[in-house]
Amino acid sequence: MARFMGPRFKLARHLGVNVFGHPKALNRGVKQHKLSEYGEQLLEKQKLRAYYGVLEKQFKKIVFNALKSKEKSEDILVQSLERRLDNLVYRLGFGSTLREARQMVSHGHILVNGQKVDIPSYKVNIGDEVSLRSKSRKIQTYASNFTTIIPAVTYIEKDTESFSGRLIRLPKSVEVPVMVKYSKVLEFYSKN
């Protein structure tokens, strides 16, 4: 699967938000300029895409599915993005960054309900057990990440002894620690 290979810090400065989680990403100045309504919508969309590492084609499908649903579109959008396997691996603390978590999944270090899954965009269902492969538990980085990083969200359950975690329930848009105006993202795509 393709992913963004350009300059990450430059993108973070352009967006005005540290979407990659690296402490030095915003060390240089961020240019302040007044944006039009369209510009604000585009910027919010780009922030959300950059944070989750999703390319435009896949992101567009996720947003259109959220817009079609009868439930609250913001919550459906967040649930679709948060249920991705690479994101759940990051939220559980297996990887220190979303990019590291994505690499762990694609290299086959992660099991879902005891089966190896190497697709980062795999949708995890409620109650599915996400665990680290027994061979991968010997890798010091993964073991230390999992034991030291505490999940900041309430919709996942973490078991440090068995190196696993579960998605307990679907998240609401207000619970997710991503500073994005979801309504602007949905407005951007509802015009097209």
Curated annotation (Swiss-Prot):
Keyword hit for Mitochondrion: no
PROSITE patterns: RIBOSOMAL_S4, S4
Pfam families per the UniProt record, alphabetical: Ribosomal_S4, S4
Gene Ontology molecular function: rRNA binding; structural constituent of ribosome
Superkingdom to which the source organism belongs: Bacteria
Keyword terms of this UniProt record: Ribonucleoprotein, Ribosomal protein, RNA-binding, rRNA-binding
Originating species: Clostridium acetobutylicum (strain ATCC 824 / DSM 792 / JCM 1419 / IAM 19013 / LMG 5710 / NBRC 13948 / NRRL B-527 / VKM B-1787 / 2291 / W)
UniProt-listed NCBIfam families: PRK05327.1 (NF003717), rpsD_bact (TIGR01017)
Complex and partners: Part of the 30S ribosomal subunit. Contacts protein S5. The interaction surface between S4 and S5 is involved in control of translational fidelity.
Function: One of the primary rRNA binding proteins, it binds directly to 16S rRNA where it nucleates assembly of the body of the 30S subunit.
InterPro entries: Ribosomal_uS4, Ribosomal_uS4_bac-type, Ribosomal_uS4_CS, Ribosomal_uS4_N, S4_RNA-bd, S4_RNA-bd_sf
Protein name: Small ribosomal subunit protein uS4B
Membership in a protein family: Belongs to the universal ribosomal protein uS4 family.
Gene that this sequence comes from: rpsD2
